[in-house]
């Protein structure tokens, strides 16, 4: 929830679902 993963989840979910979660249309790690 703090560190950006460099992914966006506007149209598709986060690619790295195990480490990253979607928040505010951006994927964050933890």
Swiss-Prot record:
Q: Where is this cross-link: Cyclopeptide (Gly-Asp)?
A: 1-30
Q: Which cysteines are joined by disulfide bonds?
A: 5-20, 9-22, 14-27
- Enumerate the Gene Ontology biological process terms: defense response
What highest taxon heads this organism's lineage?
Eukaryota
Q: Which UniProt keywords apply?
A: Disulfide bond, Knottin, Plant defense
> What does UniProt give as the signal peptide span?
none
Post-translational modification (record):
This is a cyclic peptide. Contains 3 disulfide bonds.
Which InterPro entries does the UniProt record give?
Cyclotide, Cyclotide_bracelet_CS, Cyclotide_sf
* UniProt function note: Probably participates in a plant defense mechanism (Potential). Binds to and induces leakage in phospholipd membranes, particularly ones containing 1-palmitoyl-2-oleophosphatidylethanolamine (POPE). Not active against Gram-negative bacterium E.coli ATCC 25922 or Gram-positive bacterium S.aureus ATCC 25923 up to a concentration of 64 uM.
Description of its domains: The presence of a 'disulfide through disulfide knot' structurally defines this protein as a knottin.
Q: Which family does it belong to?
A: Belongs to the cyclotide family. Bracelet subfamily.
Q: What is the protein named?
A: Cyclotide mech-1
